Regions:
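Basic, glycine-rich polyanion-binding accessory segments appended to enzymes
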Residues: 1-128
Length: 128
């Protein structure tokens, strides 16, 4: 994201090479996505008015991104800057929170997109 402290790392892995902890995923800043669920190109962006999201664990249901961010207790001052991983059709991952149910790794998954966000440290206004 322009003028952001966020850095992102992306790798494509065969499903058989997933790390052992991928199902429980102890790191909220990494996500494992079904490559076949991606439509078009991956992009990073912030929220748009009216965004909707299919959070994993909601039984395939849809929720407004604003409502999701409120429920997740993302501070209001950060919501317009919060990184979203999207494709041409949908929000794939609200970084640090949930992936989309539409992008989850499933039994038919052959390749996985592994994504990790990290925030650069800022010290006295300078990146370190």
């Amino acid at each position: 994201l322009p003028e952001s402290e966020w850095q992102v790392e992306v790798r494509i892995l065969p499903k058989g090479e997933l790390p052992a902890e991928w199902r429980t995923n102890p790191d909220p800043w990494q996500a494992f996505l079904d490559r076949d669920s991606i439509v078009g190109q991956l992009r990073l962006r912030t929220r748009f008015t009216g965004d909707r999201f299919h959070p994993l664990g909601l039984g395939g249901g849809r929720k407004s991104l604003q409502e999701f961010m409120i429920d997740a207790k993302i501070p209001q001052c950060l919501r317009d800057k919060w990184p979203l991983l999207v494709d041409d059709e949908k929000i794939l991952w609200v970084a640090g929170w949930h992936i989309s149910d539409k992008a989850k790794v499933n039994p038919q998954t052959r390749e996985v997109i592994w994504v990790r966000f990290c925030r650069s440290a800022i010290l006295d206004g300078k990146r370190v």
